[in-house]
Each structure stands twice: as structure tokens, then as C-alpha cells.
Amino acid sequence: MDRTTELLKVNKLNNSWEFCFKNFQDESKKYIVDKASIAINGISLTIANVSADSFSISVIPHTYENTNLKFINENDIVNIEFDYLARFSERSKN
């Protein structure tokens, strides 16, 4: 686990769910990139959208039904692991 963040909102869409999380306002923000991988509570997912204050993931029904995501509620704190390649790339710059 690298960090924790707050679930801001869950939107039920036609055939998926959109989970919107609070974005980081420090050096961790550099790892939150559109289409990058991110693990939330141990589940490897893809970041769908990023804004200054939040980032979101889209979840298909199979993932929703077979993971702990269906038990997460708005304002809950979740565990975050950043993409390994993003961390490696950042380290190699230094």
C-alpha cells in the first residue's frame, strides 16, 4: 500500500459503475494519470478520468460482483497502490 484516499461518489451507469476518488494534492498526484493502472484495495484497475480534485475508475459488472468494491460506500477510505511502471519511471529520472 502506498497511500489511502476517500471515495467521493459512486455512479451506477448503464452497464458499469463509476467510482470517483479524492485526488492527491502532493507529490503522489504525479502517479494519477489517465489510463494508468492503479490498485484500489488490492484490485488492479485502470484510471478512467483525472481532474484536479478527483480521479475515477470504471468497473464492469463481473469486477463489481466479484470484488470488495460492492461494499465500499461514499466517504470510505480505501488503500491505494500506484502503478509499478510509473514509480519505476519516476525513480529512473533521478
Task: Provide a role label for each language-model segment.
Residues 1-94:
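Conserved loop->alpha-helix
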